Each structure stands twice: as structure tokens, then as C-alpha cells.
Amino acid sequence: MKPKVLLAGGTGYIGKYLSEVIENDAELFAISKYPDNKKTDDVEMTWIQCDIFHYEQVVAAMNQIDIAVFFIDPTKNSAKITQSSARDLTLIAADNFGRAAAINQVKKVIYIPGSRYDNETIERLGAYGTPVETTNLVFKRSLVNVELQVSKYDDVRSTMKVVLPKGWTLKNVVNHFIAWMGYTKGTFVKTEKSHDQFKIYIKNKVRPLAVFKIEETADGIITLILLSGSLVKKYTVNQGKLEFRLIKESAVVYIHLYDYIPRLFWPIYYFIQAPMQKMMIHGFEVDCRIKDFQSRLKSGENMKYTK
């Protein structure tokens, strides 16, 4: 029986090359956020609808796979606007891939090198116990992420990493984020949290800007799923998600917004709402660094705070 091989990055030149080389020796599968646009008669391959940055979709796509091949090009994004570094996108995708491979008991992950972040990527892929091999083939990737691209939907992806304050858990970070938005003057909002939901309001307003469901997606991943509110564009296939991801064996938390389709007219979102969101998350990042500094001082560490 032929092994089942999953290709991440099967839509580009490298994917086409690999699929042609191993077509006769394996049952091929490839993932794409929009697989209907990728089907070809050149190679016998099964396309799976999957966004590599969406943890649960990657886990589902890797079901019954024997070997998984990881290659992504940071210049080819699946969102209309992507505000993130190539490094952060690569590491989030690799973390998803490594987690999914371990859950599905994939025999090995094969990585195609050629990025400045090869060592970090290989570490992420193997962080959950799956063996990782690298190919002799090296394919150089761009170090610059492309912010605006043509996309099926007017969706947004952005990432920011913050430090996990000493002695905190990921749940502490999420709860602090919710509270911080409410008491920080510069955000101009107030927040309410009840059980597994929280709401954001403009101060002195009754109708919420956004209502989120808080969901513990996996160990080390907490997702705030957008349910309703004045910032929500109605009748969209997917609603936005704000994911908090703790990188295993580190003090790094990624805050990842994806699947969000703004209600505002696109240029207004890009030039007004997006910069405000970025400024708010940056403010939270600074606050987390201060909290980490304070926690370390309390524990007796001798250190100086630097911006």
C-alpha cells in the first residue's frame, strides 16, 4: 500500500516539483484555503480545504496521513491583508503542523529548507515529538511578507507576539487582556466578561462593538471567537477569531487575528481601524513586558527594564 503524503505548499513551483517526483510512489494530498482554484489534471492529487494557519483545520487535514511535507512561501498569503512578519507566519504554521502531526501519529515530517528561520521552524515542527527530516533540495524564500494580495474574501490576518510574564499562564494573559482593554484610557472601550463570553463596548454606549466566545482550543491555545456586534459583517461564511497561542517551552505568546472580514468600507478599515487595532495590541505588548519585569523583580532577579 502506498504511503499517504500530505503537501503543505503544494500550490507553487516546489509543490508541483515534489508531486511529480513522488506521484508514482505515494498517494498524494495537498492543502489549500481555496482548493477549487488549484485542481489540475497534471498530477493525481487530492486537494483538502485547509488554512495552514487554522489549527483545527490542519489537525483534520492530517488525519490518516503517513508523511507530511512542510513548505510555505511567505509571499503567498491567503488573506487580502496580512500584517505580520514572515518569521511569525512561518512559526505559527509550523506549530500547527507539528501539533497536528503528533495528534495524528504521522510517521515523520519532511521540511524543505531555504529560509532564514530554518532552525526555528524545524524546532517547532518537532516540538511535539514527531521526527523531522530535511531535504537536500534547498529553496530560498523571501524575507519580506507581502501585505496586500488578491483574495476571495476581504479578510484580515495579523499577528503580534507578547512576552508571557513570569509566573503567568496563558489563561492569565487572556484574562488580563480583557481587563486591560477596559481600564486603559487609550483604548476608549469598556469590557464585560461573563463565564465563556466577553463583550467590548465604546464607553457610554449600550450596543456592543463585539461579542466573543472564549474557547480553549487546545493545550496552549485559547481562541476568542467573534459572535456578534457592530464590528461584525453579517452573513459571512466565517467570523473573526483572535487566537492566543503559547509557544511550547518558551515565554512567547502569539496573538493572531484571522478570518476577520471588516464591516467598514475597505479603505476606511485599512487606514483607520487597522492602525488603531495595531496600536492597541502594541500597547498590550508593552504592558506584558512591564508585568514580566515587575514579576522578575519580586522574585529577586537583578535586572533593568529596557524598551
Swiss-Prot record:
Cross-referenced Gene3D superfamilies: NAD(P)-binding Rossmann-like Domain
Origin superkingdom: Bacteria
InterPro entries with a match to the protein in the record: Epimerase_deHydtase, NAD(P)-bd_dom_sf
Pfam families the UniProt entry points to: Epimerase (PF01370)
Known partners and oligomeric status: Homodimer. Interacts with GraR and GraS.
Entry function: Plays a role in resistance against cationic antimicrobial peptides (CAMPs). Facilitates the activation of GraS to transduce the signal to GraR.
Protein name according to UniProt: Auxiliary protein GraX
